[in-house]
Amino acid sequence: MSKKVFFDTGIFFDCLESQDKKTLINHAINRKYHIFTSLLVIGEIILIMKRDAKFAEYLTGFFSLLSEWKITILVPNDGVAVICYDFSQDLTDGRMISQKTDRTHLAYATAYDCDYFITSDDALIRYKIPRRLNESDYVKPETLPLEAFKKLVMS
């Protein structure tokens, strides 16, 4: 059975800069992990790349990854809206209050029932979704850094 893996913004940059990390993702895909991301992640990547002199080169590489890995691009739905709203009302984790974009990335992965959320953001890894969402049967994907995902893929 295929596992759904959502990539946060930084993971794409890691893969663009490291052949070893690209190879890891190729192994994951060969082992039935399916890669997902969102329109918001793509937009954030483009905004970050625009600040760099190598914009065209990076953008070409990024779009090549989207195609090569057959990444599913998620769009907003009612579940994303509900989760984003509940995240915005949750003031229990002070690290996440100002992190609207990061919370939205996690909302996409949660709404679309992704099994894993891969990120380099420690606050997202430790973040506990509001109890109200758990009671509504939303489940936070297992949230891991790329190194932990590597151990999972290679096991």
Predicted segments with their positions:
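Short, well-structured N-terminal submotif of metal-dependent ribonuclease cores
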Residues: 1-37, 49-61
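General small-molecule cofactor/ligand-binding pocket signal
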Residues: 36, 72-75, 142-144
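Short, conserved catalytic or adaptor-binding loops enriched in Gly and charged residues
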Residues: 26-29, 62-68, 133-136
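Short, hinge-like loop/turn segments at secondary-structure boundaries
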Residues: 52-56, 91-92, 133-137
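Acidic, PIN/NYN-like endoribonuclease modules and their adjacent C-terminal/linker elements
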Residues: 1-2, 112-155
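Active-site neighborhoods of divalent-metal-dependent phosphate/nucleic-acid chemistry enzymes
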Residues: 72-126
